[in-house]
Swiss-Prot record:
Entries under SMART domains matching the protein: HhH1 (SM00278)
Family: Belongs to the RuvA family.
Name of the molecule in the record: Holliday junction branch migration complex subunit RuvA
Source organism of this protein record: Bacteroides thetaiotaomicron (strain ATCC 29148 / DSM 2079 / JCM 5827 / CCUG 10774 / NCTC 10582 / VPI-5482 / E50)
This protein's encoding gene: ruvA
One Gene Ontology cellular component annotation held by this UniProt entry: Holliday junction resolvase complex
Length: 201
């Protein structure tokens, strides 16, 4: 079992990271929160969850143990798989998600793509008691937008559309939504564009 991977950050997109460990590249699916945390770093450490199925072996990477713990709680809920859990953690920071579950805010949770009202309610019912112990741990929230690297709008557009297609959305509607967001907020960093797009697609 892989607990974590530490090494050179060889490749990074809003949806995946490749860590070079002594010449071996480990590709891991990541959330936007982890992307924000490791963006711009030469070396990094990702805590790993291994999803092993008959037809696939997939790694999910997290910048800290708290995000991984919340991910594991999410996938313990019936109907929530790895990609859906990652999408939830891309739309909401761990601190925001803890707050949503603690306050039973199903309406906010169902704004995440792929989460209907029934699934949102199931997440809250199943995790409310389990998540209470994590509230203080993740209260620190996510990285401030001011610390994120700024990119030209075209580059942001390309990265955002690429990330959305990797998450399973069709390219054409993704492009349309991303362009609309950049028209409203030309200086928005890529992770903000993707978060907004996830709520509109």
């Amino acid at each position: 079992m892989i607990e974590y991977v530490r090494g050179e950050l060889a490749e990074l997109s809003p949806a995946t990271a490749v860590i070079d460990c002594n010449g071996v590249g480990y590709a891991a699916n990541i959330s936007l929160n982890t992307y924000s945390a490791i963006q711009g770093k030469k070396n990094c450490k990702l805590y790993i969850y291994e999803a092993i199925r008959e037809d696939a072996y997939v790694l999910y990477g997290f910048a800290d143990k708290q995000e991984r713990e919340i991910f594991l709680l999410l996938i313990s809920v019936s109907g929530i798989g790895g990609n859906t859990a990652r999408m939830i953690l891309s739309a909401l920071s761990p601190a925001e998600l803890v707050n949503v579950i603690s306050t039973e805010n199903a309406n906010l949770l169902k704004t995440v793509k792929g989460i209907g009202l029934k699934t949102a309610q199931r997440v809250i019912v199943d995790l409310k008691d389990k998540i209470k112990t994590m509230g203080a741990t993740v209260a620190g929230g996510s990285a401030s937008a001011g610390m994120l690297l700024q990119s030209a709008s075209v580059e942001v557009q390309e990265e955002a559309v690429a990330a959305l297609t990797m998450l399973g959305f069709a390219a054409a509607p993704s492009q349309k939504v991303v362009l609309a967001i950049l028209k409203e907020e030309p200086d928005a960093p890529v992770e903000k564009v993707i978060k907004l797009a996830l709520k509109r697609l």
